[in-house]
Amino acid sequence: MKDKTIWQEVLNRGKWVIILLVAFVLSQFPIGLALFLANKQFPILQSGLLVGALSIVVLIVFIIGARKTQLATFNLSFFKAKDLARLVLSYLVIFATNLLGSLLLRLTNEVTTSNQSILNGLVQNSSLISTFFLLVLIAPICEEILCRGIIPKKIFRGKEKLGFIVGAIVFALLHMPTNLPSVIIYGGMSTVLTWTAYKTERLEMSILLHMILNGIAFCLLALLVLISRNLGLSF
């Protein structure tokens, strides 16, 4: 009987590993489409609408899946003033680690991280509509559900603390750190996001924080893109 229970537990965790991998692949469809359309020099407006439409489909699947499996309710009725203070403080900590990482990049004669360089190239050659969906919606919702939802709560169920650590490492690795500065930037970001989800026991809180981070980054990138396209400058 005990062996049967252990076998069932292994099968259940294995099922969630497969779900994690399938969900990750699904989350990459919008950016894959954006890269494909940019490579084919598809009209910017139409490509933005296509990527936006696909992103909405992916988001619906993720949100429904998270609600059905009780990873998140996406009901913000719990949100209070102290939660706003937590988000502000968390953002400032991430900003500080990003600043430290950026200073170290300068000292090593590098301008930006490998991940940011790829992102800049995508933004320059894609619609701002695509960038908005990918940065502000797809990345925060999908990455948080994967790294701070499925990994700690399902795959490591019963050992959530270990699961949060693994999820934090996976998140950092997904952003392709190639040197110490990029490890500080993405490792710091991942640590704060993980702490937020763990401490509040609300995946919605880390999603909100992630959205704020990427939303501010999107606004800055959009401004640079508009300057670049109107004045013929590059960044």
What are these regions (language model features)?
Residues I31-N39, I63-L71, G101-R106, C142-E143, ...:
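Membrane-water interface at transmembrane helix exits
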Residues L59-F79, E204-M205:
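Cytoplasmic juxtamembrane interface segments
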Residues L26-A38, V61-F62, V93, T97-T108, ...:
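Alpha-helical membrane-inserting segments
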Residues R13-T69:
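Alpha-helical transmembrane segments in multi-pass membrane proteins
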Residues D3, A96, N125-F235:
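Transmembrane helix-loop-helix hairpins at the membrane interface
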Residues N39-L45, L71-A139, L226-F235:
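Juxtamembrane helix-loop-helix connectors linking adjacent transmembrane helices
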Residues R13, V17-F29, G52-I56, L87-F95, ...:
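Alpha-helical transmembrane spans of integral membrane proteins, capturing the lipid-embedded, hydrophobic core
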Residues M1-V10:
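Short, Lys/Arg-rich, polar N-terminal cytosolic tail immediately upstream
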